[in-house]
């Protein structure tokens, strides 16, 4: 009988110990979940605060410095519902180019002329100008007076856009880039489209800019030239900032 009582007491003690241990585990789990929840809340709070570290004016000023200090870049120009008209009734549908300040430019363009799609390349540096024959694709030297690109200045395009935009506003912050909407007067886009513009027209633009000021993309939306529509969008993408570019005169046969 004595042994039975002792065993009974031992069982009660073990049961109480197990209850305490299980209760302790529950508390630990709850505390762990509590700490994890607090950590997640803090991280979300920090991320939401760090998403927009600059105002639109601040990020544009940073971008001005970045653009002014950059010596080279590459770009592409495409269109949605339109094209860019150059002298000689040349309608650029697509173009890509390489730029080195102050005066080195290479452009490869697809041009629609008299309902024909033509491809030509244009190169200039050291006050010399070359262009390819759209039929033979062979290079030839040209005087600047015959240069179809003489009214545009790709080197100046991004400078004009970033320095002359107005009413800028951050619309979103995605993939570590600021998406900004703004307006610009059509006269300030002559470096892109030349003199064939609708004067004094307020034009909507959208910019994607990295926190270091690097410009990824600019959308120019609406009417800039006489044949544009409200749905015309010029899409300019920039890349390879400050990467070395090799320049040499084309081989002319």
What are these regions (language model features)?
Residues 59-65, 94-101, 120-129, 204-211, ...:
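Extended lipid/amphipathic-ligand handling interfaces
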Residues 178-252:
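Gly/Pro-enriched, hydrophobic low-complexity segments
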Residues 71-74, 101-108, 175-181, 214-217:
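Short, hydrophobic/aromatic-rich segments at coil-to-beta transitions
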Residues 78-84, 112-116, 134-136, 223-227, ...:
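Hydrophobic lipid-interacting interfaces of membrane-associated proteins
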Residues 2-44:
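Sec-dependent bacterial lipoprotein signal peptides
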Residues 39-104, 243-253:
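N-terminal leader/targeting segments and the immediate start of mature chains
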């Amino acid at each position: 009988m004595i042994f039975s009582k002792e065993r009974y007491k031992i069982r009660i003690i073990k049961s109480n110990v197990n209850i305490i241990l299980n209760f302790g585990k529950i508390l630990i789990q709850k505390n762990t979940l509590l700490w994890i929840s607090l950590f997640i809340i803090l991280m979300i709070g920090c991320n939401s605060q760090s998403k927009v570290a600059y105002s639109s004016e601040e990020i544009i000023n940073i971008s001005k410095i970045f653009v002014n200090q950059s010596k080279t870049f590459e770009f592409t120009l495409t269109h949605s519902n339109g094209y860019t008209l150059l002298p000689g009734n040349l309608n650029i549908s697509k173009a890509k180019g390489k730029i080195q300040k102050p005066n080195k430019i290479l452009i490869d363009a697809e041009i629609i002329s008299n309902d024909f799609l033509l491809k030509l390349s244009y190169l200039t540096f050291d006050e010399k100008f070359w262009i390819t024959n759209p039929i033979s694709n062979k290079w030839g030297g040209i005087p600047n007076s015959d240069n179809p690109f003489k009214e545009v200045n790709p080197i100046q395009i991004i400078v004009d856009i970033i320095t002359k935009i107005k009413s800028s506003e951050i619309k979103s912050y995605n993939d570590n880039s600021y998406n900004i909407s703004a307006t610009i007067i059509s006269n300030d886009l002559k470096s892109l489209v030349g003199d064939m513009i609708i004067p004094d027209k307020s034009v909507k633009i959208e910019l994607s800019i990295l926190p270091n000021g690097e410009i990824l993309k600019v959308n120019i939306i609406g009417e800039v030239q006489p044949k544009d529509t409200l749905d015309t969008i010029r899409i300019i993408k920039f890349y390879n900032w400050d990467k070395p570019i090799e320049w040499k005169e084309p081989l002319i046969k």
